[in-house]
Amino acid sequence: MLEKVFKLKENHTDVKTEILAGITTFMTMAYILAVNPSILSAAGMDQGAVFTATALASLIGTLCMAAFANYPFALAPGMGLNAYFAYTVVIGMGYSWQTALTAVFAEGIIFIILSLTNVREAIFNAIPACLKTAVSVGIGLFIAFLGLQNANIVVGGSTLVQLFSVDAYNQANGVEASFNNVGITVLLAIIGVLITAIMVIKNIKGNILWGILITWILGIICQIAGLYVPNPEIGFYSLLPNFSSGLAIPSLAPVFGKLDFKNVFSLEFVVVVFAFLFVDLFDTLGTLIGVSTKAGMLDKDGKLPRIKGALMADAVATTVGAVLGTSTTTTFVESASGVTEGGRTGLTSLTTAILFGISLFLSPIFLAIPSFATAPALIIVGFYMLSNVAGINFSDYSEGIPCFICIAAMPFCYSISEGISMVVISYVVINVLIGKAKEKKISVLMYVLVILFILKYIFL
């Protein structure tokens, strides 16, 4: 039956290889079950409910990939997109998280429509490759900066940010924490970064997840030894899992179906939706093409067969995920780990999806993982995304300067959408003024985007 459904022989694989590949993929991306609730809780969302939404969205999205495209790719709420959701749309722009979920839902619907037509190719071809790369790099820096903040390695100060000290932390947050509250967690986070980095260099499977778990375990040891002292009143909780409710699945009720359509006709809301769509679209296409190239899945013309099904799985997962109560669900680049293990069909995805289902019953473990343990994951994921900077031709200043503006704007303006706006405007304006617009083959769509972004800055 499995042979008939997944065409294993045709894809030169077998059941054992596919299952092992699915387990490997899950190990490399399971960190999202701890990181996503942590990030979205900063937007005021219930952490337990977001955990359940994250697991379910990952389960459904990955199943869709297996069913629609028969590819070994897994989906989950995307890093960068969740940070944009919480820190830019909600905290920075002042929208409620319910409105932000509505923007994700709208993006998913648009993505479904684009996936049913050839519009996605037109959009993909309209944006220069260097700008797509710059967006990825900028998000990487933004994520790494969030990791440094979540670990309290950097704190607010008279110089906007400064290296951690207990006094600086207390002054920035208006609390009276001690070394045994915050100081030890900073040291543990730094150790976690080093441990994760070593495992990445050694190419250990599941390095990011293992980095989180090891950092957390070291924290538990410190708590038992009295080096870490919980103080819930100022945000430092016990690191031990709370099994008082058994292995019950946290209720979805606080976030399920909480869409708010009041602001959907505002220009700023449209910009937010576009930012979600832009990043999701190019992140998905980049992941699909990059991983499938590594696996030798492209046809003789360099195209990915059944890409429409893969994009549809991504679009459906995003739409369903928004209703469940999580930020944009997208294809994970960590799928490459399963492909490296020999995964070639949807059976790999099915295996990963089943493991996400099992994880629903392990919420006390994932929800007990502190931000200082997940911060190293953010920093290392930031490194992965930053490594794409090699694809930008900085010797061509007409490309390099706009890309630099994008990369710098995202962390320094604390906004992914501002980086996207600035790179599109600067790229078009610079190349028009120096007479390179025709040479660069700037599309009509790019000019339309420039007008929209300029209107945003004038009227918002």
How should each PLM-predicted stretch be described?
Residues H12, K16, I191, V270-F274, ...:
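Alpha-helical membrane-protein architecture signal
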Residues G44-L63:
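Loop-to-helix transition at the N-terminal end of transmembrane alpha-helices
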Residues M93-I217, L350-L460:
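Membrane-embedded alpha-helical modules
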